[in-house]
Amino acid sequence: MKQENKIWLCYFIVTGLLLIFTNSCKKAKDTPVDKLPGNEVTDKDGNIYKTVTIGTQIWMDENLKTTKYSNGDAVPTTILDISGESAPKYQWAYGDDTTNVATYGRLYTWYAVTDSRNVCPTGWHVPSDAEWETLKEYLGGESVAGAKLKEAGTTHWQAPNTGATNATGFTSLPGGYRTLNGAYASIHLSGYQWSSSDNAPLGWGQLMRYNDSLLVRGGYYKPAGVSVRCIKNI
C-alpha cells in the first residue's frame, strides 16, 4: 500500500511540474517576442517605448515624444509662423496642446530630425527612405502595407479606417501635421512619418490615411511638423 501511495505521489508531482512548465511555455509563446518585458527604449525625456520586430527591422511602436536630442540639447518649440526661416529646427504638440502628446507623439521639422545630435535615443535613428521601402516591401507592397501598420478600430482613426488590422503591432496613429504658418490639420485622418532622406527641396516621408490601406511615399515641406518613428541601429 505504501509503495502504491508513493507511486501516486510521484505521479502528481511530475504531472504538476509538467502543467507548470506547459503553462509557462504557453504564456511566453502567446506573447509576441517583440512585446516581452525588457524590449523597451527610453528617450532623453524619460518616455518609454515598447518595440516591435517586423522582418529584420526593429521599430518603436509609438510616435516619438521627446523634446531633446540624444545629447540632451533641447529641440525648441514656437507658436510663430516659421515660413521665413531657412532651416528651422522645432518640435510641437498637435494644436499646441500637450495632452495630445501621450497618444500621438510630437511633430518635428525635417531639419530637426536630420540634425546630427539625433532626436532618437542612442542606438536608434530616424529611418531612411530606403528603410521605409524595405518595410513596405516586406509587408506586401504599397497597396496593403498601411492596413498592417495602422491601429485597428476607430478610437483614434476616423471611420472607416479602411483595412486596418495592425497585424504587425506597429500601431500607426493619425497624428496630423503642422504647416509653416502654424496651422494644424488632419489629426484622426492621416498619419505622416518623416524619413531622413532628402528629396530637395522636400524631404521624403510616408503617409497612411483613414480611408484606404496604402502606405504612400511622398515629399513634404521640410519646415512642416510631421511625426517620427525611430528604428534601431543594426
State where each predicted segment sits.
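Bacterial N-terminal signal peptides that target proteins for export
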Residues: 2-12
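Beta-rich interaction/scaffold domains
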Residues: 2, 26-27
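Conserved positions within compact, well-structured domain cores
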Residues: 27-234
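C-terminal motif of bacterial Sec signal peptides marking the signal peptidase cleavage site
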Residues: 21-24
